[in-house]
Design a protein with these regions (language model features):
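Conserved Lys-Pro-Asp/Glu-containing loop-to-beta segment of HAD-superfamily phosphomonoesterases
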Residues: 142-171
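Acidic, Mg2+-coordinating phosphoryl-transfer loop and its flanking beta/alpha structural elements
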Residues: 163-203
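Metal-dependent phosphoesterase signature
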Residues: 54-91, 99
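Surface-exposed amphipathic alpha-helices with a cationic face
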Residues: 90-97, 150, 171-175
């Protein structure tokens, strides 16, 4: 049914909360803002980082760029490794690859960072292509990321594709492009968020995700 499966990265393949939140706190400290608690800052996980600083703190463009620079200063060297792969993801990817599925990554994270994470957890070999943002922030919206992944792999039959993610941006991006989606509840988005965004399927954990994907 679905021969091409697109995975979000943060909150779907790996739990990157610690590294992202600590790096956001580092950036906010530099700007002179006392960061909120971890639950507040978890909203930074998933959306493009520039968009988050602007939306949550109403920074002007110059301050956004300073915040992004400081975020990356810490995240590139330390934060990217403050990360854990969700239990069972590697087994799932192996089974899907064994069934001949084409696996793609569609993330708002810059491609070099995404590749670092995938290589760190030794799951990079399962993916045919990694689509993500450019370092300057271009192509960071999830719709653009998904479109780019499909274009670069010459995928025309949208009915053969499904997107998996934990936030509304993943689901909305999939709908905008015209493909089905699965929302996962083990990441950073809740049932209401994923349901209201229009997820075609919602699963609680990696086991449920595996059962669903292997049933297609």
């Amino acid at each position: 049914m679905f021969s091409t499966i697109l995975f979000d990265l943060d909150g779907t393949l790996t739990d990157s909360k610690t590294g992202i939140i600590k790096s956001v706190q580092y950036a906010l400290d530099y700007i002179g803002i006392k960061a909120g608690n971890n639950n507040d800052l978890s909203n930074f996980i998933g959306p493009p980082i520039r968009q988050s600083f602007k939306e949550f703190y109403d920074f002007d463009d110059n301050t956004v760029e300073k915040a992004v620079e400081k975020f990356r200063e810490r995240y590139f060297s330390v934060g990217v490794y403050e990360n854990e792969m969700y239990k069972g993801i590697d087994v799932l990817l192996s089974m899907l690859k064994g069934k001949g599925k084409t696996l793609l990554v569609a993330t708002s994270k810059p491609v070099p960072l995404a590749n670092t994470v995938l290589s760190h957890f030794r799951i990079d070999n399962y993916f045919t292509f990694v689509s993500g943002a450019e370092m300057n922030g271009n192509r960071s919206e999830k719709t653009e990321v998904i479109e780019y992944a499909l274009e670069q792999n010459n995928i025309i039959d949208l009915s053969s594709c499904i997107m998996i993610g934990d936030r509304k941006h993943d689901i909305i991006g999939a709908k905008s492009v015209g493909i089905k989606s699965i929302g996962v509840l083990y990441g950073y988005g809740g049932f209401e968020e994923l349901s209201e965004a229009g997820a075609d399927y919602i699963v609680k954990n990696v086991n449920e995700l595996s059962e669903l994907l292997l049933s297609f």
